[in-house]
Structures are given as C-alpha cells and as structure tokens.
C-alpha cells in the first residue's frame, strides 16, 4: 500500500506541490517558445515526458555501473539518444509540428528538468520508481505548458487546437485576436501569474524571508 501511495505521489506531486516550472523555475525557455498553440505544447509535453521517463529508467538501470567521474556524460548520452529518437519520430510522422518546434526538441537534451531528475532521483532509486518520477515531472511540465498554451492560443488567435472557438471579426464575428498573446513576453507573464496563483493557494511554497 505504501509503495502504491509513493508511486501515486511521484506522479501527482510535480503537478502542483513540486512543479518543475512553477516551483523550481526549470525548463522556462521552451515554455516561452512552444506555447503559442496547444498542439505544439501538447506534443512538447509528450516529448519531454517520454525522454524524462525513459532516461530516468535507463540511468537507474545502470546506476551501479556508472563511474562517478563520468556520470554526467553517461546521463547526457542516454538523454541525447532518446531526444534523437523523438526528433526522428516527429520528422517522420508530424513534420509540420516538428518544424514549428524547431530547435526546441533538440534542446530537451539540456533541459534542467530532465538532467535534474536523472541526477537527483534516478541515480539513487530503482528503475520503476524512477520511470514513474519521470512521468510525473513530465506531467508537471506539461500542466504549465498546456495552461499557458490554452490562454495564448485562445486569446491570441481565438482558436484551440487550430479550431475557431471565439468568432473572429475577420469571419464576421466579434473577437479581435490579441497579437501580444502570441509573443514570448505574454508566456513569461502568464507563467508569473501561475506561480503567483499556486503560491497563493499553497503558501508553504513561498520562500522564507532571509
């Protein structure tokens, strides 16, 4: 029972209690760049979840055989291999989205969330809990991406997943798209508002005054 509770906590805790973007402020670069559309935010979420979960699993699997002096290099090699797989799959089956995501798929290699979980958790834990931890942190990352992407696409273009939701003036409706929401600064402010909202709801996440 306790094991099941721990696995459940590993999946759910990174969403609000220990969100990698909102609390740890990691992975912000891609969060600013790929959230103009829900479609790209969703695909990026799946990509990061895939890489984080499997890199955690493989690092944990061989953790006792990795010399301490080269552990970061080994982790990077595993992560890079998985990112190449993701990149090739996207180019083969989702080429348009792959072009929109551009270099940010490759930059998953240097994503602090992926590297951080491999070093802090997978190197000290069994493979299955490490895999679940990767899924959880991918969900936490995706929660922020999808929330930001929802508001940016809805207010920036009046659409969700490319489908018109708010009747646009150009089509005889009433909504004038807000172009500012499609620029990177809007994502920065939205993430800031999310951090404020989460820390208002969970005051224990506020840093203690020095």
UniProtKB/Swiss-Prot annotation:
Catalyzed chemical reaction(s): a ubiquinone + n Na(+)(in) + NADH + H(+) = a ubiquinol + n Na(+)(out) + NAD(+)
Pfam family of the protein (one): Rnf-Nqr
Compartmental location: Cell inner membrane
This protein's UniProt keywords: Cell inner membrane, Cell membrane, Ion transport, Membrane, NAD, Sodium, Sodium transport, Translocase, Transmembrane, Transmembrane helix, Transport, Ubiquinone
Function, in words: NQR complex catalyzes the reduction of ubiquinone-1 to ubiquinol by two successive reactions, coupled with the transport of Na(+) ions from the cytoplasm to the periplasm. NqrA to NqrE are probably involved in the second step, the conversion of ubisemiquinone to ubiquinol.
Family recorded in the similarity comment: Belongs to the NqrDE/RnfAE family.
Protein name: Na(+)-translocating NADH-quinone reductase subunit D
Organism: Vibrio cholerae serotype O1 (strain ATCC 39541 / Classical Ogawa 395 / O395)
Upper taxonomic lineage: Bacteria, Pseudomonadati, Pseudomonadota, Gammaproteobacteria, Vibrionales
Gene name in the database record: nqrD
